[in-house]
Amino acid sequence: MSRFETQFATLNAKNEGAFVPFVTLCDPTFDRSFEIICTLVDNGADALELGFPFSDPLLDGPVIQAANNRALTAGHSSEDSFKLLEKVRSKYPEIPISLLLCANLIFAKGLDAFYQRCAEVGVDAVLVADIPLLAKEDYVQAAKKHGIQPVFICPPNADEKTIQGVAKNSEGYTYLVSRAGVTSAENQAHAANLDTLVEQLKAHNAPPILQGFGIAQPAQVKEALALGAAGAISGSATVKIIERNLDNHEQCLAELAEFVQTMKAATK
């Protein structure tokens, strides 16, 4: 069983949902980022979704774009992100780790080399945000060759064919987008048809569904679980805490700890 499967099975047995925070690797620096990620795990994160700093992110709203820029300004490369992942994995052998990336980042290194490096540092799953199902083949093949689980996004406007494709090709978990647009903690609305999408994904035996985009409050975690999702992903709200505490690292870690504890409590 993969780390994601093991974690979902453990949570199911306890009748709990998953809380998964997202941060950008090396934001604001390599060392601080490591401490931030440790704080997330130590305070109850069930899995991690992590991004590589990239100058032209597609789905990212202003908060996560700023995080990318901070890491890039600090001079951090994709190889630094891999080294940081290696450090996280050696400290936390069990935590499921997923990467959320743009295709260009993978392409720059070469598909095979990228997924091989993911396997070497202990990544479990990779979601390529801007690869449609129709263009998935090379990515899926490279991922599977190296034992990495490919994850796909189910958008709120997905038709039956897309839902079927996402369910069939995703491994580890399924990323259900709450609404159209870019990531943001401000826009906390979600599409009206999410419960139907969850039902349809489950009917096609999709892996456990994690709902993301606009998840900033414990009530939204409860809502995601009530809709039938297995858990919720929170990116912008997590990264915002880093952004507003750049001059006070201790305060940053304290606020992150409290945020994760509250969000995790909502899954029980």
Curated annotation (Swiss-Prot):
Keywords: Amino-acid biosynthesis, Aromatic amino acid biosynthesis, Lyase, Tryptophan biosynthesis. It is an enzyme of class 4 (lyase). GO terms for molecular function: tryptophan synthase activity. CDD domains: Tryptophan_synthase_alpha (cd04724). One of its GO terms (cellular component) is cytosol. InterPro entries: Aldolase_TIM, RibuloseP-bd_barrel, Trp_synthase_alpha_AS, Trp_synthase_suA. Tetramer of two alpha and two beta chains. The alpha subunit is responsible for the aldol cleavage of indoleglycerol phosphate to indole and glyceraldehyde 3-phosphate. This is Tryptophan synthase alpha chain. It comes from Haemophilus influenzae (strain PittEE). The gene is trpA.
